[in-house]
Regions:
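Flexible active-site lid/hinge loop adjacent to a nucleotide/diphosphate
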Residues: 191-284, 290-291, 296-303, 335, ...
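Walker A (P-loop) phosphate-binding motif
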Residues: 133-178, 185
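Residue-level signal for inorganic ion chemistry
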Residues: 174, 212, 234, 270, ...
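A short helix->loop->beta-strand "cap" motif at the edges of active sites that frequently abuts
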Residues: 142, 263-268, 285-288, 422, ...
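Adenine nucleotide phosphate-binding catalytic loops in nucleotide-utilizing enzymes
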Residues: 246-253, 267, 287-408
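ATP-dependent carboxylate-amine ligase
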Residues: 1-92, 116, 245, 359-364, ...
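P-loop NTPase switch/communication element
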Residues: 177-192, 196-198
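Extreme N-terminal, non-catalytic leader segments
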Residues: 88-142
Length: 547
């Protein structure tokens, strides 16, 4: 049993909600003793099944507290036999207490003293003003952009914030790396939940808020705001499954869709038309829709534009705006450094999304192009996200990739920079709270795409998994694929694995690392060894390696 007070819009309701999660058969009856006890305490006769009885008890307890009974609902979660009862709330203490007493009622443990205390709990809530901690529309004075998806959220958030700031506006954003006001870090850590959004929206300097939003915050606390003006949904892939009752990618998409569901009717939702799961969320949206695609001939794009909508698409190496019969060139990918002239397709996806969001904010085409052109893939603008260095004739690609699709993109991009006949060494691993299937998938991708695989262990991110277990799963997959001879013999941390790969490499080789833990130490080592950002050093060599 779990009771959770969700302070903002969530997967159950687009308002603050209490979630009461139970392990329960849908037709499980109310025990006879509980029915008799409830009749004595509340003077009511319960329906026969728990699933029918609990909403009635919640309603009666609200009345006894002096509150209007809310409309309660049930939802089956992905975890077998897990059901969630949910209802809206306004006062925290009494709302949670009602959930606790509802469970006690079904268990036959409800007593009159507990029920009689509810008005006092409500009065205390009101004295303390213990209400949902989210930013209501009447308290929000600036435009807000919500950014969600599985991969690319932080990069898209950073890029859009840079575009806004480059045109002269004060911008605040929150992301996995912290809360920033005009580029200055004011809170360090992962702030993709409601606390980060509240901090940005409360800052008196900020004129535009860009709010990266991860599924964890939505599931555990709800959104940190009532609505946004523009939202972006990038993609959905299998990540963080089997957590908090979410076991399928379809339900994961629904959780992330909360960000686009709360976009104001007069606002704009930006959806990636290349991802069928993202495109399917159109039915949940109340705002206008803008689509993006890396295929100008995508049927969804053509139908959307023909129906009066607009889209930002990749057409060869141009990024263009399609609206009605017009085709407007926004910029060429050679002028978008973060895409490495279009080689990094997953970064192109982020550029398209940020561009559509910028246009939705009223940013001019010229300001958009200027912002994209000055956002470089380095530690100044996008630390840890596809940062490429040339070092002694080798390429080192450092990226935050942490799942199967991220690793696949990392390998494909790294290969695109290499000349034939050279080797790609890949450092692979992820956080321990991922499903076993994620480690299996990483093993398959590494076995298929790398010439040499270094399995990494990150103790800081074991998150309950025994040390060595994730590495063992990946090792078994790679060996079963006949690629055991391409495995480095021991698992190392990120920094030591990179040193080992560098020592074994030759000029012309590339080393790609899934780096989530030791970024700063790695960047320091590369700097001390004289490595240069590849976009700067590429001019000295057509192959992209230092001369």
């Amino acid at each position: 049993m779990e009771i959770r007070d969700l302070d903002g819009p969530n997967m159950f309701l687009l308002c603050p909600a209490i979630k009461l999660e139970l392990v329960l058969d849908a037709d499980e009856p109310v025990p006879e003793d509980s029915s008799r006890r409830l009749s004595e305490v509340l003077g009511m006769t319960l329906p026969e099944t728990i699933i029918d009885a609990l909403p009635a008890v919640v309603s009666a307890l609200h009345e006894r507290a002096g509150l209007t009974p809310p409309e309660a609902g049930w939802r089956a979660l992905d975890t077998p036999d897990h059901l969630a009862l949910f209802y809206p709330w306004e006062w925290r203490g009494v709302a949670r207490r009602i959930a606790e007493l509802a469970v006690a009622a079904i268990d036959g443990e409800l007593n009159s003293d507990d029920v009689d205390a509810l008005p006092d709990i409500l009065a205390n809530d009101q004295r303390c003003d213990d209400r949902p901690e989210y930013v209501r529309d009447e308290d929000r004075r600036i435009p807000a952009v919500g950014v969600t998806g599985t991969n690319g959220k932080t990069t898209t958030t950073r890029l859009l914030s840079h575009i806004v700031r480059a045109r002269g506006q004060h911008v605040g954003w929150c992301s996995t790396s912290g809360v920033y006001i005009d580029g200055e870090l004011v809170l360090d850590g992962d702030y993709t939940g409601p606390a980060g959004a509240r901090r940005v929206l409360a800052d008196p300097l900020v004129e535009v808020a860009v709010l990266e939003t991860a599924r964890g915050g939505i599931l555990l606390r709800g959104l940190g705001y009532e609505s946004n003006d523009v939202s972006v949904m990038l993609n959905v892939s299998a990540d963080h499954l089997d957590m908090h009752g979410i076991a399928t990618i379809g339900t994961l998409a629904e959780v992330k869709s909360v960000v686009i569901q709360v976009t104001r009717p007069e606002g704009t939702v930006v959806l990636n038309a290349d991802d069928p799961l993202v495109l399917a969320q159109r039915a949940r949206v109340r705002a206008s829709i803008a689509l993006t695609s890396q295929d100008a001939n995508n049927p969804a794009i053509q139908a959307h534009v023909a129906d009066g909508g607009w889209a930002v698409v990749r057409d060869l190496d141009d990024v263009v705006l399609l609206e009605g019969e017009s085709r407007t060139l926004l910029f060429n990918l050679s002028d978008a450094p973060m895409t490495y002239a279009g080689r990094a397709r997953h970064m192109v996806e982020n550029v398209l999304a940020a561009s559509a969001a910028a246009l939705s904010l009223g940013i001019s085409h010229a300001d958009l192009a200027r912002g994209v052109a000055t956002f470089t893939p380095d530690v100044r603008h996008n630390v840890g996200r596809l940062n490429v260095y040339g070092l002694d004739g080798r390429l080192v690609v450092v990226d935050y990739a942490h799942n199967e699709s991220g690793l696949q993109s990392l390998i494909e991009f790294s290969r695109s920079l290499m000349s034939p006949g050279h080797r790609l060494r890949v450092i692979v691993g992820t956080a321990g709270d991922r499903q076993d299937s994620v480690f299996v998938a990483l093993g398959h991708v590494a076995a298929a795409g790398a010439d040499m695989v270094y399995l990494k262990e990150t103790p800081k991110y074991l998150r309950g998994r025994p040390a060595g277990e994730g590495v063992a799963i990946m090792r078994g997959v790679i060996e079963a694929a006949g690629a055991g001879g391409r495995l480095y013999d021991v698992a190392l941390g990120e920094y030591d694995a990179l040193l080992a790969a560098l020592d074994a490499s030759e000029p012309g080789d590339a080393i790609a690392i899934m780096c989530v833990d030791e970024q700063l130490r790695i960047f320091g080592m590369l700097r001390d060894r004289g490595a240069r950002p590849w976009v700067e050093s590429a001019a000295s060599s057509s192959s992209g390696q230092d001369a």
